[in-house]
């Protein structure tokens, strides 16, 4: 067999995937499969390979299920209610605490994140109880240097389930942690909630001392600026250096991978070590035997980061093959590395880093050499084949050298783009063709920076000189990234392609890796299938049951998105405050493939609804900006026209009788004057698939009364979406009598306290008997409209309410909410 380890690795992948997506009672089946496969492999000579594959499938499923189901009765996932419980938790830090930076109101806030192996739990004022399992600790601020990997600690805080997605389609943190075997999160308010636990160790580990020394060494003679911190991030895996717009710039240019301790770092170290040892005349066995411990020392010194461990395993397999003087096959070595990693830590299969690492390296093993050979053989200006290379002119030799290097770089970039594209879209909602060009510049510069870092750490002299060279190289990387990011059409946002993309995608890769494309017929068949898959992916799936309209309400109730099927004139109503816009609204828009908002409308002058307008104008600029008529004391509302003018975006004010993105405005009226901004909030009446929505964000009691007087029975709607005004009563009885809704959505947040729904309102709506949903409790909601039904789903996709319409003419049907 050409690549004997490829199929076993795929069997383990299939087993882990089956354990995640098939029913929970797969456990006995996977155990049976593992035993059956082992028996078949041991007793039936001809069925050895089949039995081995079945056994590996079962082993992969069992290995993953062992991380998902608490086997110990004292596991914290059994003992603690995920809804939240205050207490103290005791355990061992499983890693070095990682500091994350978050920008809030123009200031950088520090937050510490670390995994904890639990040994004990004390609920409230009770006694200590034995416990096991893993939790994730998230704490405001940064604890002191006494807390490091392997330290015994006691932490006080709120133990609860991790948060789910902030909006439909965004990153699901709870699922991510669950797949890593972490089911609970401990939230702390300050480093004062951390204490040393029993048996605490005062001796700082060698890896912590090395990182402290290395950061000081690499910053010697350099200013304390972003480039210096990025050098720490790239050479030492210091994640804190990647914060703010720097992270986004490298992400969009497709060069963020250089800051993860991954294959680029490990391969460069391995090549440098082997070259140096070979110059000394040492044998392969000696070179490999000395290089591998040094590689693993670097991995351990930088904190055993998953990307570094993956790359070290791959490199160890390749170097081991070279040491033993065995025929090398990169794809076969890659399969062995994946097999080992997934059996030891199956949750890595669901990490974007794992998928990108292995898919990109697999692509580099399959495609670039063939593409380069094809180009060199078919280029119009290829040299005379009868003229020996030794007789070429100096200009011709220089041209050939440059062309081959450029061709190799472009083929490598294209192969990496082809391999990473679906995963990048699925995980990061980003397509970056400019990465092919950007990596031609950034990757060589990053290699030079890493070499300078290595010389700075290893050389006793010239430290400041090597650091200066690395600093200049890092500025070159920043400049190249910014230039490539600014190229029109170089990158764009894209919606997740969906599961239907993965099956043909995987089949194409398996075919390319397993079947030699050495005949014209095979090559034509493969490329035809790849072209068909690409065409279907770019055109997007056509779902006959796709909703005719969708209303997305964000968790805080301060922003709404109206999406009409087949209509590009969608609407963003409000943006939330600056933090909500940056953390939720803009990422969600990009997750749906929106780089420019067709229409942005501001409902009223509450800063919690329009504070994020500058963020949206910068990140996903709208084609037009709309605001209601009326006077307000809000400085932000008064600044809207100036913001639009500065961004060269058309701005207009609307009143009752106008339309916004084709949706009628029914409030406010230009002739009316309201003393409070909430009473003059813009109210929209939107019809989708025969369903009528009344959108009245934070409409005050005076505004509600004015609407009832003016519209009368014309206010009737199937769904009422409103919020909590700053003063006055929300959803008054007269207003509800005029609207006569079949479903009410109270769109409000839980912070600050004034945004929360008052108990009197909750009691009154319960007595009304109309199904009511509260975003402060449920989170973001998505209302999907079909002609025969209306469904409301939360951010996880769970059904929360449904309205059926059996007879649209008589408006009969039933409504349910849960």
What are these regions (language model features)?
Residues 57-257, 583-587, 596, 630, ...:
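Membrane-interface helix/helix-cap signal primarily in integral membrane proteins
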Residues 15, 91, 353, 420, ...:
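Residue-level signal for inorganic ion chemistry
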Residues 1-78, 82, 86-87, 141, ...:
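N-terminal leader/targeting segments
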Residues 7, 15, 23, 46, ...:
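Hydrophobic alpha-helical transmembrane segments in multi-pass membrane proteins
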Residues 2-43, 351-354, 358, 464-515:
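Membrane-embedded alpha-helical segments of integral membrane proteins
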Residues 143-145, 151-152, 156-158, 175-176, ...:
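Non-globular, low-confidence helical/coil segments that flank catalytic cores
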Residues 203-221, 230, 238, 246, ...:
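Hydrophobic alpha-helical segments of integral membrane proteins
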Residues 2-6, 236-240, 302-308, 387-390, ...:
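Hydrophobic alpha-helical transmembrane segments
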């Amino acid at each position: 067999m050409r690549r004997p380890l490829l199929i076993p690795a795929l069997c383990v992948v299939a087993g882990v995937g089956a354990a995640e997506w098939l029913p929970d009672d797969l456990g006995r089946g996977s155990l049976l499969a593992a035993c059956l496969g082992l028996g078949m492999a041991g007793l039936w000579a001809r069925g050895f390979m089949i039995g081995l594959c079945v056994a590996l499938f079962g082993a992969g499923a069992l290995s993953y299920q062992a991380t998902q189901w608490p086997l110990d009765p004292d596991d914290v996932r059994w003992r603690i209610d995920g809804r939240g419980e205050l207490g103290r938790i005791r355990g061992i830090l499983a890693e070095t605490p990682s500091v994350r930076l978050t920008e809030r109101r123009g200031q950088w806030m520090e937050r510490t994140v670390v995994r904890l192996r639990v040994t004990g739990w004390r609920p409230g004022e009770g006694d200590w109880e034995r416990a096991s399992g893993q939790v994730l600790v998230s704490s405001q601020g940064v604890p002191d240097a006494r807390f490091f990997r392997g330290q015994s600690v006691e932490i006080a805080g709120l133990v609860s389930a991790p948060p789910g997605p902030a909006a439909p389609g965004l990153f699901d943190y709870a699922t991510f942690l669950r797949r890593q075997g972490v089911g609970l999160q401990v939230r702390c308010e300050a480093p004062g909630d951390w204490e040393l636990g029993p048996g605490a160790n005062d001796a700082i580990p060698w890896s912590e001392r090395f990182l402290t020394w290395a950061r000081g060494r690499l910053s010697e003679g350099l200013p304390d600026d972003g480039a210096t911190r990025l050098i720490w991030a790239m050479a030492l895996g210091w994640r804190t250096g990647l914060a703010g717009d720097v992270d986004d710039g490298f992400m969009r240019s497709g060069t963020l991978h250089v800051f993860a301790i991954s294959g680029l770092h490990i391969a460069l170290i391995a090549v440098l070590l082997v070259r140096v040892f070979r110059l000394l005349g040492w044998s392969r066995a000696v070179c490999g035997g000395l290089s591998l411990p040094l590689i693993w020392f670097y991995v351990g010194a930088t904190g055993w980061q998953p990307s570094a461990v993956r790359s070290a395993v791959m490199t160890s397999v390749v170097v081991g093959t070279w040491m033993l003087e065995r025929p090398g096959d990169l794809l076969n070595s890659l399969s062995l590395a994946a097999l080992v990693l997934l059996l030891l830590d199956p949750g890595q299969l669901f990490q974007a880093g794992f998928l990108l690492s292995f898919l990109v390296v697999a692509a580099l093993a399959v495609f670039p050499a063939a593409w380069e050979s094809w180009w060199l053989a078919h280029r119009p200006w290829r040299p005379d084949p009868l003229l020996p290379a030794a007789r070429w002119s100096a200009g011709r030799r220089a041209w050939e050298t440059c062309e081959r290097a450029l061709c190799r770089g472009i083929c490598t970039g294209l192969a990496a783009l082809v391999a990473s594209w679906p995963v990048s879209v699925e995980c990061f909602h980003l397509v970056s063709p400019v990465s092919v060009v950007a990596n031609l510049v950034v990757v060589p510069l990053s290699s030079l920076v890493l070499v300078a870092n290595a010389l700075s750490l290893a050389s006793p002299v010239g430290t400041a000189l090597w650091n200066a060279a690395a600093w200049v190289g890092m500025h070159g990387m920043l400049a190249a990234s910014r230039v490539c990011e600014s190229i029109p059409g170089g990158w764009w946002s894209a919606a997740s392609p969906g599961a239907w993309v993965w099956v043909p995608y995987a089949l194409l890769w398996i075919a390319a890796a397993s079947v030699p494309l050495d005949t014209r017929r095979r090559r034509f068949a493969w490329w035809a299938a790849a072209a068909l898959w690409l065409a279907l992916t770019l055109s997007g799936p056509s779902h006959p049951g796709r909703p005719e309209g969708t209303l997305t309400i964000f968790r805080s109730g301060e922003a709404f998105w109206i999406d009409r099927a087949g209509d590009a004139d969608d609407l963003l109503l409000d943006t939330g405050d600056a933090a909500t816009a940056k953390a939720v609204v803009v990422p969600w828009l990009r997750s749906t493939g929106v780089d420019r908002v067709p229409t942005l409308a501001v409902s009223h002058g509450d800063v919690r609804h329009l504070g994020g307008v500058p963020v949206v104008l910068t990140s996903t600029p709208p084609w037009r900006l709309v605001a209601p008529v009326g006077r307000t004391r809000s400085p932000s509302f008064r600044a809207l026209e100036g913001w639009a003018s500065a961004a060269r975006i058309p701005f207009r004010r609307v009143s009752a009788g106008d339309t916004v993105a084709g949706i009628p405005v029914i409030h406010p009226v230009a002739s009316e004057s309201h003393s409070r901004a909430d009473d003059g909030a813009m109210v929209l009446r939107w019809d989708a698939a025969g369903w009528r929505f009344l959108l009245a964000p934070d409409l005050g009691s005076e505004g509600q009364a004015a609407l009832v007087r003016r519209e009368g029975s014309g206010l009737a709607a199937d769904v009422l979406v409103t919020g909590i005004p700053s003063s006055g009563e929300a959803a008054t009885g007269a207003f509800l009598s005029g609207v006569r809704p079949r479903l009410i959505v109270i769109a409000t947040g839980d912070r600050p306290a004034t945004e929360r729904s008052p108990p009197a309102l909750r009691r009154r709506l319960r007595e009304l008997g109309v199904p009511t949903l509260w975003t402060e409790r449920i989170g973001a909601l998505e209302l999907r409209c079909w002609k025969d039904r209306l469904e409301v789903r939360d951010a996880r996709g769970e059904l929360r309410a449904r309205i059926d319409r059996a007879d649209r003419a008589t408006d009969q049907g039933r409504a349910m909410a849960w």
